[in-house]
A protein has these predicted regions:
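Helical segment within the ABC ATPase nucleotide-binding domain
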Residues: 163-176
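A short, surface-exposed alpha-helical micro-motif characterized by mixed small hydrophobic
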Residues: 190-192
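Helix-to-loop junction immediately C-terminal to a conserved catalytic motif
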Residues: 48
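Conserved ABC transporter NBD signature motif
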Residues: 56-71
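Conserved ABC ATPase "signature" region
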Residues: 95, 99, 105-121
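Catalytic Walker B motif of ABC-type/P-loop ATPase nucleotide-binding domains
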Residues: 149-153
Length: 245
């Protein structure tokens, strides 16, 4: 479980995250949505301990991140597809992460197989496609079989097969009782897999409700999309008129 309580973050004069509160529960897929610049990535970096909060508290499975003696079994992160040494193979990349987490190298093979990279385990990641890098990031998050996972835009760069694979993976992990917090712009996947949806805009929480309640609030042939657009209409930094004049 992830609990974010009254969290704010300032970068100089800019208030990037403003009094954000929400929870992501075990056995569920909680999506964090919002326009570019809404503060989603900053929130995720604060959960990961990469950015300090200016105020408020964050707990994971009832404890602060620094209180864990075995963090890798509590929470896993995939926050950027390019946080890799391009000269390392996929196997080497996971090996040093496993060692840092106190795991053995025997934990690496099953994870590479689960994300579909077992056949390219000895290929340098500098030769990976964007979609393969996304799979490697998810493999990193899965090391240690953590109770909680935080994934930032995991579907970016995936082809159709990859999106279907990711969908089944997320649903399977939730069915195992894991807590998943996922930032996304893919409303189709949110509608298929989501349990709860938190929508941010300009650093604030604009909506925090179940996926089903959000869909019910929408209208037309794409109700989730219509509800999202209505909620975020005053928070879009780069608005355009599309094909109209």
């Amino acid at each position: 479980m992830i609990s974010v309580r009254d969290v704010s973050k300032r970068f100089g004069e800019k208030l990037a995250v403003d009094d954000v509160t929400f929870e992501a529960e075990q056995g569920s897929i909680t999506y964090l949505l919002g326009p570019n610049g809404a503060g989603k990535t900053t929130v995720m970096r604060m959960i990961a301990g990469l950015t300090r909060t200016s105020s408020g508290t964050i707990s994971v499975n009832g404890s602060g991140l620094r209180d864990f003696r075995d963090t890798i079994s509590e929470i896993g992160f995939s926050l950027g597809a390019f946080a890799r040494n391009p000269g390392h193979t996929a196997e080497q990349h996971l090996r040093w992460q496993a060692r840092l987490g106190g795991l053995t190298t025997s934990d690496i093979g099953p994870v590479l197989y689960r994300v579909g990279l077992d056949q390219v385990a000895k290929r340098p990641v500098g030769k990976f496609s964007y979609g393969m890098l996304q799979r490697l990031g998810i493999a990193s998050a899965l090391l240690g079989d953590p109770k909680t996972l935080v994934l930032d835009e995991p579907a970016n760069g995936l082809d159709i097969e990859g999106i279907i694979w990711l969908r089944e993976l997320l649903l399977g992990l939730a069915a195992e009782g894991k807590c998943l917090l996922v930032a996304s712009h893919n409303l189709t996947e949110v509608e298929i897999t989501g349990t709860r949806v938190v929508i941010m805009g300009k650093g604030k929480v604009l909506s925090d409700t179940s996926k089903d309640e959000l869909v019910t609030a929408g209208s037309g042939p794409r109700p989730l999309e219509s509800a999202y657009v209505a909620i975020t209409k005053d928070s879009v930094e780069y608005a355009a008129t599309g094909g109209t004049r």
